[in-house]
Regions:
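Extracellular/periplasmic Venus flytrap/periplasmic-binding protein
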Residues: 1-47, 85-94
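Extracellular/periplasmic periplasmic-binding protein-like sensory domains
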Residues: 44-110
Length: 110
């Protein structure tokens, strides 16, 4: 239906989102990365594009970006995410402890 690119670091997606709203594709595949993800997801939701209405697949959302975006703006979307070390489960806590012991307390996971 369409393909559009934005410069790395872009935060204004109104034109692209308007095209999406007009064409109403079944699936939206976004390769937005970095801090641009925060603006992208918030602007999608503000435009009424949600996971309930369309399928959105995204390349990557990091743990920090997810916090900035807000869970309410990610509901219903699919992403290939990196490992989230803050996941609050016994198995994850055990893994993080073992990882930090082996690689150092400041070693990032994912």
């Amino acid at each position: 239906v369409g393909e559009e690119y934005a410069a790395l670091g872009s935060t204004q997606f109104g034109s692209t989102i308007n095209k999406i709203r007009l064409k109403r594709p079944d699936v939206i595949y976004a390769a937005v990365v970095g801090g641009s993800n925060v603006a992208w997801f918030k602007q999608l939701k503000a435009a009424g594009i949600t996971g309930k209405k369309q399928t959105l697949l995204t390349l990557s959302v990091t743990e920090d970006e997810a916090h900035g975006i807000g869970g309410e703006n990610l509901l219903g979307f699919y992403s290939a995410m990196k490992y989230f070390q803050s996941l609050d489960t016994p198995a994850n806590k055990k893994f993080v402890t073992a990882f930090k012991k082996m690689w150092g307390k400041d070693a990032p996971i994912g």
